[in-house]
């Protein structure tokens, strides 16, 4: 056991974890992963473990990752680690925040309790909170930090587009749209979305003269991409030629990214909370400022 903190990274998020360790000026080490043919995971950790460990791993495609984090933390505790910080830029299972149909598990609640039982601190970026407004009402541990990428996204927009109109596709996106617009004095508007299933949405935009504007669609995440795709198509039909998208979490399942680009969207900018070709905004400095060692 030694006392200098260590940052532990995983193969699927290695670049971002190494960048964070560099900014924190602490040692980086890999958690080695092996997946057996039957789907089970084996984890190998460094032999020498300090009293404080930062784990940097984003929780997209979460099911394997959650059990692997469970094994990792339990083994770290077994080796005498006293303080474990999770830096998870994308936090999974935040959307199921109520029992929508009788008998449904409220996964947000149970994942929150799992993380609270494992970690002394949890730090994330733009968690998808709707009915539950505060992250520390979900994850009740010693320290919980919910960061916003709004200023970083706003800076990217200002760098790439002159006099943009910022559009949020629905009420849930309003908090990010307002932050970005206020920081840079951008004009903005927010649409109204009706969800008809996992992959079906309808977005209605308020009346506005958008034809000659450069429009930036802003949302916290893109999963199926249907919200952004639907909105981009409407804007194209209204005669908008310059459409961009800026998002925090680029999940983009299946062919959704290609489908979004096929609507005529010129560029997609995302943070590196989830590894994706659209990543152009690093969260390392934002996370580093929030981690207290």
Q: What function would you assign to each model-found segment?
A:
Residues 1-293:
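PRPP-associated nucleotide enzymes
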């Amino acid at each position: 056991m030694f006392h200098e903190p260590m940052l532990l990274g995983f193969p699927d998020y290695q670049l971002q974890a190494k960048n964070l360790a560099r900014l924190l000026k602490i040692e980086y080490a890999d958690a080695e992963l092996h997946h057996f043919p039957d789907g089970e995971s084996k984890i190998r950790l460094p032999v020498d473990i300090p009293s404080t460990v930062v784990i940097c791993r984003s929780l997209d495609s979460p099911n394997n990752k959650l059990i692997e984090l469970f094994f990792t933390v339990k083994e770290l505790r077994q080796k005498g680690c006293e303080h474990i910080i999770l830096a998870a830029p994308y936090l999974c299972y935040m959307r199921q925040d109520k029992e929508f149909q009788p008998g449904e598990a409220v996964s947000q609640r149970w994942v929150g309790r799992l993380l609270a039982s494992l970690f002394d601190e949890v730090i994330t970026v733009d968690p998808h909170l709707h009915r539950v407004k505060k992250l520390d009402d979900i994850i009740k541990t010693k320290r919980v930090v919910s960061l916003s990428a709004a200023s970083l996204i706003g800076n990217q927009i200002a760098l790439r587009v002159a006099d943009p109109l910022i559009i949020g596709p629905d009420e849930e996106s309003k908090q990010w749209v307002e932050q970005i617009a206020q920081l840079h004095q951008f004009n903005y508007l927010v649409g109204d979305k009706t969800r008809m299933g996992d992959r079906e949405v309808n977005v209605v935009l308020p009346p506005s003269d958008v034809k000659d504007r450069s429009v930036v669609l802003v949302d916290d995440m893109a999963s199926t991409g249907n919200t952004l795709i639907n909105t981009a198509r409407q804007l194209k039909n209204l005669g908008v030629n310059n459409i961009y998208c800026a998002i925090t979490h680029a999940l983009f399942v299946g062919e959704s990214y290609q489908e979004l680009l096929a609507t005529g969207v010129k560029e997609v900018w995302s943070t590196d909370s989830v590894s994706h070709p659209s990543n152009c905004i690093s969260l390392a400095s934002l996370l580093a400022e929030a981690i207290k060692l």
